């Protein structure tokens, strides 16, 4: 009987599920992986009281964590473990409790074991909240056996 190979989309979905299973920080964040494909991902988060800072806005670290998680799903979508080498974020506008954040990552360029991804974070009104750029490095291991 022939061995069935995963399609790239199936590989990305399985990679995302494997990461969620093993990522306690993502589980505690309360976000959802809404879409994943090869080199891209979409994660959503409703902002709750526990996400706010002393000014009553969403804490910048929460927004960074959301963007970083989205970047992580995108760069690990090939079933090759990848880690962040460098990440930067620019905050554009404040986020309030009950806002829904939509974070979307897209591969810009992959070269060898390294890659660059851009992530946009928007609110439910499609207002730009933050721009994140992540540089990843594959570490030479699979997330799961194929």
Regions found by a protein language model. Give the residues of each.
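Terminal targeting signals and extreme-terminal segments of soluble enzymes
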Residues: 1-146
């Amino acid at each position: 009987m022939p061995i069935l190979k995963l399609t790239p989309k199936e590989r990305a979905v399985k990679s995302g599920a494997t990461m969620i299973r093993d990522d306690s920080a993502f589980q505690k964040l309360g976000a959802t992986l809404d879409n994943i494909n090869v080199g891209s991902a979409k994660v959503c988060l409703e902002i709750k009281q526990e996400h706010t800072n002393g000014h009553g806005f969403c804490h910048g670290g929460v927004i960074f964590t959301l963007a970083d998680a989205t970047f992580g799903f995108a760069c690990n979508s090939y079933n090759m473990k990848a880690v962040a080498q460098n990440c930067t974020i620019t905050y554009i506008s404040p986020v309030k409790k009950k806002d829904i954040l939509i974070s979307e990552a897209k591969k810009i360029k992959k070269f060898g074991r390294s890659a660059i991804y851009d992530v946009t974070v928007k609110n439910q009104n499609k207002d730009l909240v933050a721009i994140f750029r992540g540089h990843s490095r594959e570490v030479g291991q699979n997330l799961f056996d194929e």
